[in-house]
């Protein structure tokens, strides 16, 4: 399947690469199918690209690359929705707001994206009782 993307133009993807958000993403409830693409070969950043809207591509990354102490408990309801059987099948990503320099780039740690890589079901989870916010500066020194 060939899709149009925000950052890479036309890209060929396989059906098994498609990630399904059954309820969409907050603010984009009609966008239910995405694919994860590398931003570039050397970059730790990825693109969560909508299959339906070429202009909708979020820059994402593993939070653990920049925030060593990042942790939260995944609600049992989310585990059931995503049909998680093994914690090793779960991938956690956070949406980044890219700025002019990496030192000014922020991560939304309040609303991580959880992907079950076994069945490709995903959900953006809002951590209500959390010390995390929507704009945490990346801890660049710890990732270098």
UniProtKB/Swiss-Prot annotation:
Q: Does this entry carry the keyword Cytoplasm?
A: yes
Arranged from A to Z, the UniProt key words for this protein are: Bacterial flagellum biogenesis, Chaperone, Cytoplasm, Translation regulation
Query: Pfam family example for this protein?
Result: FliW
Enumerate the SUPFAM superfamilies for this protein.
BH3618-like
Subcellular locations according to the entry: Cytoplasm
Q: Note whether Chaperone occurs among the keywords.
A: yes
> What's the main place this protein lives?
cytoplasm
Q: Which Gene Ontology terms of cellular component type are present? A: cytoplasm
Which top-level group of life is the source organism from? Bacteria
Q: Which GO terms fall under biological process for this protein?
A: bacterial-type flagellum assembly; regulation of translation
* NCBIfam families in alphabetical order: PRK13285.1-1 (NF009793)
Write out the similarity annotation: Belongs to the FliW family.
Assembly and interaction partners: Interacts with translational regulator CsrA and flagellin(s).
What role does it play? Acts as an anti-CsrA protein, binds CsrA and prevents it from repressing translation of its target genes, one of which is flagellin. Binds to flagellin and participates in the assembly of the flagellum.
Query: What is the name of the protein in this document?
Result: Flagellar assembly factor FliW
Q: Which organism is it from?
A: Bacillus pumilus (strain SAFR-032)
- Provide the taxonomic classification: Bacteria, Bacillati, Bacillota, Bacilli, Bacillales
